[in-house]
């Protein structure tokens, strides 16, 4: 009778040694992001973090997100060094719009077969994103799950917690007719609309690795990491106290994201002619024959963040943002919505 061979976890497709090697590789990344409130290092069962000093009535704000199918493009291009920045950006930009300062971040990395080099690149990007946002990378989960993912394909999720003073929560309730809308530029499509983007590339049969737009490779424009707006916006809030609402322009574009922070009866009137749309969006529209309204419903079209302030604070707000290295502009204003009108009106839409 044949003796059954002794099976190990590695035989089943899970390499514990690889997981431990990854942890060693990323300890220094986490250390660089450490805030004074964080207690202990990586490797514990749970991460501990004190509330920063100076808050009277601190309110915790949490968020979770992924990077959508931009990840598929990253895998296809074998480019893993900035997708972690995207992951952090998608979470922290959602927190800062209510006035919150991000405190700590955790990530979830799931794969069929762990490639330590790839995972280390991803986590290094996450660390870079945390540094840009001023939050600590306090832990995460690396799950090697054979049979769940194809080969070394992986998926990502991020989780972030921030804090805001209860009396200073920004919720859009003070937005009023006549207020101004300011915009901050995006770096490209950020992390939204990539299912449409990939479909356009497929239908057009475009060799994106050999196309240049404005002197830059198209792949670079499509993979440009999502901008992290935390530090300029926190500076704006602290120095002016004038911010009434902010909208992170993600999936759904201007049309779906601005209404999330508008009170009933308010309408945002946005002048599409107030900025030059980056070439990557024009290329996508042309190659996919995408209708103008659909462009603004799916993609950010060059606008990453919209900020509402009273008219008398416009100049001060623009100055503070410029001091912080931003290139803001006035994109529109708040009006009283007519009966049955949409909450966002796009003016000067170009004919398609």
Curated annotation (Swiss-Prot):
Leading EC class: ligase
Domain of life: Bacteria
GO biological process, one term: adenine biosynthetic process
S-S pairs: none
Cellular compartments per GO CC: cytosol
Reaction(s) the record says it catalyses: 2-formamido-N(1)-(5-O-phospho-beta-D-ribosyl)acetamidine + ATP = 5-amino-1-(5-phospho-beta-D-ribosyl)imidazole + ADP + phosphate + H(+)
Localisation: Cytoplasm
Pfam families per UniProt: AIRS (PF00586), AIRS_C (PF02769)
InterPro entries attached to this UniProt entry: PurM-like_C_dom, PurM-like_C_sf, PurM-like_N, PurM-like_N_sf, PurM_cligase
Molecular function per GO: ATP binding; phosphoribosylamine-glycine ligase activity; phosphoribosylformylglycinamidine cyclo-ligase activity
Entry EC no(s): 6.3.3.1
Entry-linked SUPFAM superfamilies: PurM C-terminal domain-like, PurM N-terminal domain-like
Keywords attached to this entry: ATP-binding, Cytoplasm, Ligase, Nucleotide-binding, Purine biosynthesis
Pathway assigned to this chain's UniProt record: Purine metabolism; IMP biosynthesis via de novo pathway; 5-amino-1-(5-phospho-D-ribosyl)imidazole from N(2)-formyl-N(1)-(5-phospho-D-ribosyl)glycinamide: step 2/2
HAMAP family, A to Z: AIRS (MF_00741)
Family: Belongs to the AIR synthase family.
Stored NCBIfam families: purM
Cross-referenced PANTHER family: TRIFUNCTIONAL PURINE BIOSYNTHETIC PROTEIN ADENOSINE-3, TRIFUNCTIONAL PURINE BIOSYNTHETIC PROTEIN ADENOSINE-3-RELATED
Protein name in the entry: Phosphoribosylformylglycinamidine cyclo-ligase
Organism listed in the record: Pseudomonas syringae pv. tomato (strain ATCC BAA-871 / DC3000)
């Amino acid at each position: 009778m044949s003796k059954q061979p002794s099976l190990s976890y590695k035989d089943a497709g899970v390499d514990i040694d690889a997981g431990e090697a990854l942890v060693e590789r990323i300890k220094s990344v986490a250390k660089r992001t450490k805030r004074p409130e964080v207690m202990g290092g990586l490797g514990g069962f749970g991460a501990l973090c004190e509330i920063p000093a100076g808050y009277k009535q601190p309110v915790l704000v949490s968020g979770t997100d992924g990077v959508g199918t931009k990840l598929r493009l990253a895998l296809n291009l074998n480019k893993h060094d900035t997708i972690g920045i995207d992951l952090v950006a998608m979470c922290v930009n959602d927190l800062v719009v209510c006035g919150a300062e991000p405190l700590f971040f955790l990530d979830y990395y799931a794969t069929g077969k762990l490639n330590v080099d790839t995972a280390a690149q991803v986590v290094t990007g996450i660390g870079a994103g945390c540094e840009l946002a001023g939050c600590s990378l306090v832990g995460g989960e690396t799950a090697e799950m054979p049979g769940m993912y194809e080969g070394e394909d992986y998926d990502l999720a991020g989780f972030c917690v921030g804090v805001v003073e209860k009396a200073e929560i920004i919720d859009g309730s003070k937005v009023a007719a006549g207020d101004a809308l300011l915009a901050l530029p995006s770096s490209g499509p950020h992390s939204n609309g990539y299912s449409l983007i990939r479909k356009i590339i497929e239908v057009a049969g475009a060799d994106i690795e050999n196309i240049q737009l404005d002197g830059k490779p198209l792949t670079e424009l499509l993979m440009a990491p999502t901008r992290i707006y935390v530090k300029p916006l926190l500076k704006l809030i602290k120095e002016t106290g004038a911010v009434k609402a902010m909208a992170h322009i993600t999936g759904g574009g201007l049309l779906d994201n601005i209404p999330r922070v508008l009170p009933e009866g308010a309408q945002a009137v946005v002048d599409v002619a107030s900025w030059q749309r980056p070439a990557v969006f024009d290329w996508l529209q042309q190659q996919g024959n995408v209708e103008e309204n659909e462009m603004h419903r799916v993609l950010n079209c060059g606008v990453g963040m919209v900020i509402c302030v009273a008219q008398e604070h416009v100049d001060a707000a623009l100055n503070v943002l410029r001091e912080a290295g931003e290139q803001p502009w006035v994109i529109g204003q708040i009006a009283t919505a007519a009966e049955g009108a949409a909450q966002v009106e796009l003016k000067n839409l170009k004919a398609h």
